[in-house]
Curated annotation (Swiss-Prot):
Organism of derivation: Pseudoalteromonas translucida (strain TAC 125)
Keywords from the UniProt entry: Aromatic hydrocarbons catabolism, NAD, Oxidoreductase
EC number, as in UniProt: 1.2.1.10
NCBIfam families in the record: ac_ald_DH_ac, PRK08300.1
Name of the featured protein: Acetaldehyde dehydrogenase
Gene: mhpF
CDD domains assigned: ALDH_C
One GO molecular-function entry: NAD binding
Catalytic activity of the protein: acetaldehyde + NAD(+) + CoA = acetyl-CoA + NADH + H(+)
Length: 300
């Protein structure tokens, strides 16, 4: 099968983990990695894998986009620079998959709304790692009955959180809470991130609380949650229900654990895994459309 060529912008934890995912794809071919530190481990690993690299930021990539037939770019830098990065690649006709909390384009949480995205869009936002882990659960409840309030708490190991993510904590909470409402279906959303310095590092843990407008239909919500867990596990095998749904009046609580594949950072970094796997899955759907195939033709 012909592959769609891609560029990775950002050579940190997320960009490097995503590189390994893309190398396994049957539809996507990573050809460039962009960084700003010539000595970064991410760029060194990319070179070892035969990927072209530049340490001159986005401007080091732009002159090569047409010659190298790049159709999709992934931004794993920071919300502060994403707008400029996106504008520059969009001007060259490249689709931008945004892994920062910038949220310029529409949100995408694959098992909830991937199939509803318009093929003509030029920027799609992957929310945040906490959003990718928890919004499917909010949606699993809200598709059964209206959710008045949704609150998510994402706990991640300190070692898995690089400087880019740390700079974007405020954007993380704003973007995630917005997507809990827009994609999860809660009338009001709230998001909290906890960075845990424990050693040895803990797996990503997520807690989701939903307040339903009426008495929860326990059987229907439980079935919906289990169905959604299975959908997420298709691309994140380490996504597991630890407890719940637990019902207390109108409050529905769900407790998750996310173990990574260990592509770049060890398995405790499930927060990287769910973000990069979601981005790869989203890009593969757009790539199939570019190749003129229906997404149902390939279950990647």
């Amino acid at each position: 099968m012909k592959k769609i060529k891609c560029a990775l912008i950002g050579s940190g934890n997320i960009g490097t983990d995503l590189l390994y995912k893309l190398k396994r794809s049957e539809i996507l071919e990573p050809v460039w990695m962009v960084g700003i530190d010539p000595d970064s481990e991410g760029l060194a690993r990319a070179r070892e894998l035969g990927i072209k690299t530049t340490a001159d930021g986005i401007d080091g990539l732009i002159p090569h986009i047409e010659a190298d037939e790049i159709k999709i770019a992934f931004d794993a830098t920071s919300a502060y620079v994403h707008g400029e990065n996106s504008a520059k690649v969009n001007a060259k006709g490249v689709l931008m998959i945004d892994l920062t909390p910038a949220a310029i384009g529409p949100f995408c949480v694959p098992p909830v709304n991937l199939n509803q995205l318009n093929a003509d869009i030029k920027n799609v936002n992957m929310v945040t790692c906490g959003g990718q882990a928890t919004i499917p659960m909010v949606a699993a409840v809200s598709r059964v009955q209206p959710v008045e309030y949704g609150e998510i708490v994402a706990t991640v190991s300190s070692k898995s959180v690089g400087p880019g993510t740390r700079q974007n904590i405020d954007e993380f909470t704003r973007t995630t809470s917005g997507a809990v409402e827009q994609i999860g279906g809660a009338k009001k959303g709230k998001a909290i991130i906890i960075i845990n310095p424990a050693e040895p590092p803990l797996l990503m843990r997520d807690t989701i609380h939903c307040l339903t407008e009426t008495e929860p239909d326990q059987a229907a919500i439980t079935a919906s949650v289990h169905e959604m867990i299975a959908e997420v596990q298709k691309y994140v095998p380490g996504y597991k229900l630890k407890n719940g749904p637990v019902f207390d009046g109108r409050k529905v609580s769900i407790f998750l654990e996310v173990e990574g594949l260990g592509d770049y950072l060890p398995k405790y970094a499930g927060n990287l895994d769910i973000m990069t796997a979601s981005a790869a899955r989203t890009a593969e759907m757009f790539a199939l459309q570019m190749l003129g195939q229906s997404p149902s033709d390939s279950q990647s």
